[in-house]
Amino acid sequence: MQLISKIKEELFFARKMIQYRYGPRCWYRYIKNKFFPVFLTRRVQPISIPVNCDFEWHIMTPKRGLWMTYWAIRSFLYQSNLCPKIIVHDDGTIDEATARMFESKFSNVKILRRLDADKFFDTTSNIPNIIKRARKSKCFFILTFLDHFFLSNSSKVMITDNDVLFFGKPQEIIDFMLGASKIDAMYFVGEGEGRNALPVDSLYKKKYADILDDAARLNSGLIIFNKSKIKLESMVEYFEHATDFDHHLIEQSGWGMILSQIPHAFFPEATYKFRGGVEFPVIFKHFTSPRRHEMFAYGIDKVRQQINS
């Protein structure tokens, strides 16, 4: 069944690349970047940059996503001139040797193994039981909500997916992390009129009616927040009113509801994007599943060219 799914995925991407007339070079890049992630990561030279700012960046990735993660990190370090402590969360597929290899490529990166994260939640007594129960959700992405929050150790935190790249200077992030912003959270939003379903009951929706629209717009591909402003009680309340812990948006709607309760803003839609090209003035692009081929076919090499120019 998994093989059939992979074949269908590749046929989908092939049709897209044919439809938009991708040339031989893009096909070569797609094959190279997608199918040889660990091999390519092993070959890159280590980068040693001292941590120069007081915030943490948390990313979760499978082993096959390490090449994407590598370029997400490289693009941010280059464009922002910030060097935070970066914690890459293992989804359970990264072996010890591969984890140590990836850590060796950056002086500021630590891989947190899934087993260690599981042990933390199992043995930490002051985490409410409802949080521990929610973490056992069938929706894998719940880990990018709970693990990234509870395992972060700085007041300011950035969270991204691993399928993101920065193509310009992220001034909004720089200002926030350096204390030049008056808000306590900023997040990436869906383009246009798109809204997410919020799997919460009517009482909760009524109580927070004034922020529901903002919460429903959040996309968790890029969020930044002041952790000290988020109350544990707010997270507990969200799960107490969640209608289905296994809902596919339980994580994303959770971030939306929690972050929308504190002073917040959206990243500008004109420069932080899902769709379209990556030329100026685009700063950031989230290469979500239907557009993942774009990251492999031209996104990674665009970043490489910017860094080497």
Predicted stretch roles:
Residues M1-N52, F296-S309:
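Membrane-proximal basic amphipathic "stem/tether" segments
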Residues S75-C83:
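Short, acidic, metal-binding catalytic loop of nucleotide-sugar glycosyltransferases
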Residues F145-N196:
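GT-A fold catalytic core of metal-dependent nucleotide-sugar glycosyltransferases
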Residues A99, E103-L151:
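Active-site-proximal specificity loops/subdomain of glycosyltransferases
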Residues T61-W67:
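Active-site beta-to-alpha loop of glycosyltransferases that engages the nucleotide-sugar donor
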Residues K85-G92, Y187-V189:
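Short internal beta-strands
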Residues E56:
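Cell-envelope/extracellular polymer assembly enzymes that use nucleotide-activated donors
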Residues G192-E193, L212-R292:
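Catalytic core and acceptor-binding pocket of nucleotide-sugar-dependent glycosyltransferases
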